[in-house]
DNA sequence: AAAATTATTTAGTTTTGTCTAAATAATTTT
DNA sequence: AAAATTATTTAGACAAAACTAAATAATTTT
């Protein structure tokens, strides 16, 4: 597998993420995601097409090729292993890891990453609950549902938090919700879409729709 | 302290290393050290001068300013901490650490490095025996002498190996010489400048001038 | 179906870091 | 002290990655 520049890697990773949702990715979406200009996206897309990492016809959207997908998984593996390292070994808080991992992910020594993986004990998920691809690019694909769509009375476990800001971390810490927390929705209120939830045998409490939207759970 | 590009950092580090030896650094020396062309060096020197990291008059040599020296120590700190991490935690061998650290050193989060330092237990020297600057840029300055200049009969401890190749590591492992080994020169042979040395109470053995040149020791 | 709006691409610049070839300065040899 | 050699700088080009402004294509509104 060839080596790509940090810039190319950031584009590849963004396309991978966006195409999970929409199937195909547009110029404007990418420009917005990467905080760059549409014209810059077009330039880079031509380059990545030439390198056979993606397919696209002018004015249609982009899609990674099989090879492009493999490259993306490699970058995501590096990113999430570093995040795990920062949180677990260096005691970074949850909201601090992403920014640093955004740089570390571009150091591409295969040996470094495989040894790091081993040192960390082959973790399956990063500090936000996102799965870490293994050395062959395989990763866990457990069915996760948004907390807002969990039916009342169904026990579930928090598996993933999307938003990685300091603000959401503060709130989650206050509410004592972390990845792995087992909870149940008691009631859904139509007016403001807030949820009443219960953790274990503790008294139930309320969380806002905005918060619930960012929490994914798995059925148990 | 501002942020510098990987390229600028590699130049700064190289100047720092070379000026330790010669006091001042020339265009050709730098070009050779960095495997680049003299014209590229001149370009970069203008840039670093503009940023007040070095002093130079055309056709004289270069010297880092005080600020330039501080920046250099920061890069060296990152480089050596990563080398220590790779060797100690990830079990890289001695000859493999430098190349990877050459990339990792350019990830410049201060918090990352200070936490890494703490995680590693504030190590004083990297795997080759070179001192690691602390968070304030201070580092050990123990007097080291080349093994070829150690007088016969004076006990000393191996503190440092300059050459970092796989080849020298193989030889040192075979001879059971590592950093920290206590030894004594028994005899120096004029003909080929080979040395007879003894480790502890074991039988004495011979090492070549080429090998001895790359080993530094400290008196005990 | 035209017109208006929105999305995307193209054209032309800019910055950073590199290179080759040519010019000039400094040093060494004769 | 010239001449020859070596070191350094300058001039001009190039590639990567970004940007702005203008052109064009696609979509939506009227
Ligand atoms: Mn992340
Ligand atoms: Mn990144
Ligand atoms: Mn090194
Ligand atoms: Mn480097």
Name these PLM-found stretches.
Chain A
Residues 45-46:
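Short, hydrophobic-biased segments on the C-terminal half of alpha helices
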Residues 60-79:
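Basic, amphipathic "hinge/linker" alpha-helix immediately C-terminal to the N-terminal HTH DNA-binding motif
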Residues 39, 95:
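Key DNA-contact positions within bacterial/archaeal DNA-binding proteins
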Residues 1-12:
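Short alpha-helical segments that sit at the start of domains
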Residues 105-211:
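Mid-protein regulatory/catalytic core that forms ligand/cofactor-binding pockets
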Residues 21-31:
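Short acidic, hydrophobic short linear motifs in intrinsically disordered regions
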Residues 49-57:
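A short, conserved structural fragment
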